[in-house]
Amino acid sequence: MSGNSSTDMYLFKKSLKELKGKKGKGTELISVYVPAGRRLSDISQYLRQELSQSSNIKSKTTMKNVQSAIEVILQRLKLLKEPLEMGVIIFAGMIPRGGPGTEKMEVYVLEPPEPVKTFVYRCDSLFYTDPLEDFIQDTEVYGVILVDRNEATIGTVKGKTITVLKKLTSGVPGKFKAGGQSARRLERLIDDAAHQFMVRIGEYATESFMPILEEKKLKGLLLGGPGNTKNEFAEKDYLHHELKKKIIDTFDLCYTEEFGIRELLDKASDLLRDLDLMKEKNLIQRFFKELIKDDGGLSAYGEAQVMKYLEMGAIDTLIVTEDIGITRVTIKCNNCDYTQEVNVKTNEMFKFEEQLKTKACPTCGGAMYIDEEKDIIEHLSDLCNVHNTDIIVVSTDTEEGSQISRAFKGMAAILRYKL
């Protein structure tokens, strides 16, 4: 992997999406999960046994395709160096490109972001990708409870995603200002209703957060809201005692709904400095601070400008959105050594391939062909490694990421020096 967590995760998710869309003609697609630390010789021996048993498959075509896939995996295993700290996942099989006879062998070798725990060998019409789903789940979760006398919101912040789990209203009226016994009795009723509301919040919080805590994924609880209600809720025994230990801090807020969660995240930014959401937000805000300077500061944006400055080694931090949708294509001449690299919108690759059929080499007039296709983010990550540039792949689910996507077509940068 590249060594950059956001790039690695983006490429891993992309591979997963592609793999889930692959379908074989029969039960002839092979999936192999090799656990971390497992001897490759043991895996190879197991696969050779499967290769031998595959001769019993009745359909000659299916038998041939299964055997070809196993042989390809055996070849790939020979190229790997032990020990494998994370393990490895290999998919191989004949994938139809159209009608009968259009099948082509496809092989995918993935280094997982977390160690593979269990050996899996599966032969099916689809690649077995269920375990990969677990790898892309953010493990650290923050619980959020926003509360005032009238309403409450319970939610989670997980990576870049804010999820509202429950909204509650109390029905508790405001304080009664008049005097007399009736007023005091009414005030007691109001206080009792407020207490019962706190109990309900605690019950829903326990129901929402205890399963996450038991999975050891709950990093902490953040409490917020206007007034003193949040402090009362935190200090008294409304929360499960194990959850109470997870309270990180309380925050004075103006709101108690989803906007309040965003307000809380702003106020808790120092505490959540390592959370992906805050990393992205702070970095993009830094870019915009440079952008609004009279001379443009240390900002760069757009494909042409960013590519130019990156190849010069002038970029400190590169920001790319997940939805950029560009493929880096290397085309070559059949006749001479002419080579060209171009960026093509991924959804226009078919059109590009058709146009290439009529394109002649500018050097000798020979026919051109596609030598390599690479996701632009993978290409940019390789360039960043060469020039010691940080790269972060941001989600468009956030307001800041969406701004980069819309305004700058998914590519922006902070420079090392003014150009």
Curated annotation (Swiss-Prot):
UniProt KW keywords: Cytoplasm, Protein biosynthesis
Q: Where in the cell is it found?
A: Cytoplasm
GO molecular function per UniProt: translation release factor activity, codon specific
Q: Which GO terms describe its cellular component?
A: cytoplasm
One Pfam family here: eRF1_3
Q: Name the domain of life this protein comes from.
A: Archaea
Q: Does the keyword Cytoplasm apply?
A: yes
Q: Which InterPro entries match?
A: eFR1_2_sf (IPR042226), eRF1_1_Pelota (IPR005140), eRF1_1_sf (IPR024049), eRF1_2 (IPR005141), eRF1_3 (IPR005142), Peptide_chain-rel_aRF1 (IPR020918), Peptide_chain-rel_eRF1/aRF1 (IPR004403), Ribosomal_eL30-like_sf (IPR029064)
* Known function: Directs the termination of nascent peptide synthesis (translation) in response to the termination codons UAA, UAG and UGA.
State the name under which the record lists this protein. Answer: Peptide chain release factor subunit 1
Source species, please?
A: Methanococcus maripaludis (strain C6 / ATCC BAA-1332)
